[in-house]
Amino acid sequence: MRAAVLEDGRFRVREHPDPVPGPGQALVETAACGICGSDLSAVAHTDEFLRASRDSGTTSFLFDPDRPLVMGHEFSGRVLSYGPGATGPEPGTGVVGLPWAVDPGGVVRTVGYSNAFPGGFGERIVVQAQALLPVPPSLDLGLAALTEPLAVGFGNIARSAAGKDTPAVVVGCGPVGLGAVAALLERGAGPVVASDPSPLRRAAAARLGAHAVVDPAAQDPVRLCAELAGARPRPTVVVNCVGVPGMLNRLLHTVPRGTEILQIGGVMTEDVIRPVVGIYKDVTIRMCLTYPPEQFGATLARLAEGRIDPASLVTGEAGFGGLDAAFASLRRPEEHIKVLIRPGQGGTGVTARRAPADDMPR
């Protein structure tokens, strides 16, 4: 199969061995695959990324950087076939799936972060058959690839204390942060303040219905949320979706007493916090990786029912040959929100899908 293979920090488009579904597994033809923030970290900070996996004792993000790797875990596609004993949606059915597979030794691997299980930056993927969900006909198959990143936002808000009239702040409005904004609004939280330096991303948060959007260089989002919530400080849910060293400590110092901080952004290096500040303020910190499995299906349903417009979040598309350009562009968040990789698209650049909104907050 054709694939964009990561070698020495660059993507090279070439032939790669076809994955073969084992017992309980499915073979899927890739329709589209999103580029995740963790993909950017894995390429730019490979040693730290792998060290964190080893130090945490997880096998989900371990790969050999000296061997070819086909990344991409935010995928959608069509079922081609099944391995022994596997059943699921009929071949030809459009699907999305939780990106996991079990290797012959019984170890769970993440598709796209395993040398043995190539991801959606290749033409075909092998995943566990039970991880697949059919895409409803009301949802474009390519746009269904946004199910995974949005599920991270929805799933972690579902685990939080956020409810009706809970003041909330979302720091970082990439796809995960925007999923968190939508999830908070769905639960009746408010005021919901979204913070991002990028006007493009602030505009997306505003379109979703955030009560206020701010540039953190100009205004502190936590203080603004407190002002909007009223004179008496109230416990707040703060969702930190940026992997910026020092941000967690900064939030500890500014949030109201009793706040819950969801740390979703992955800081690749060691960081420093002053725990006693959080202790004195009775702050809860929840480190967040992914989502309860049922939230994946619930997020797919939200997209299919039109409760979120995935097309408004996709700002660019590229083929395998455009991956280097797409990664470079996503490191400049003022340019894009989500870039989808489409196997059939040619060229070496990123094609813009959506112009910045005229009513973009400045």
Predicted regions and their residues:
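C-terminal hydrophobic helical "lid"/dimerization subdomain
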Residues: N249-L252, P293-R362
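Short Gly/aromatic-enriched secondary-structure transition segments
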Residues: S41-F49, P356, M360-P361
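Residues in the short beta-alpha loop(s) of Rossmann-like NAD(P)-binding domains
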Residues: S198, V267, Y291
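NAD(P)H dinucleotide-binding glycine-rich loop of Rossmann-like/cofactor-binding domains
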Residues: F61-P68, H73, G97-V171
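Residue-level recognition of short, solvent-exposed, well-ordered loop/turn junctions
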Residues: G22, E90-T93, Q128, G163, ...
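Glycine-rich cofactor phosphate-binding loops and adjacent beta1-alpha1 units
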Residues: S160-K164, R207-T284, P361
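Mid-domain Rossmann-like dinucleotide-binding core that forms the NAD(H)/NADP(H) cofactor-binding site
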Residues: L139-A218
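Glycine-rich beta-strand-centered segment in the early N-terminal region that forms part
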Residues: P19-C33, E48-A101, P136-S138
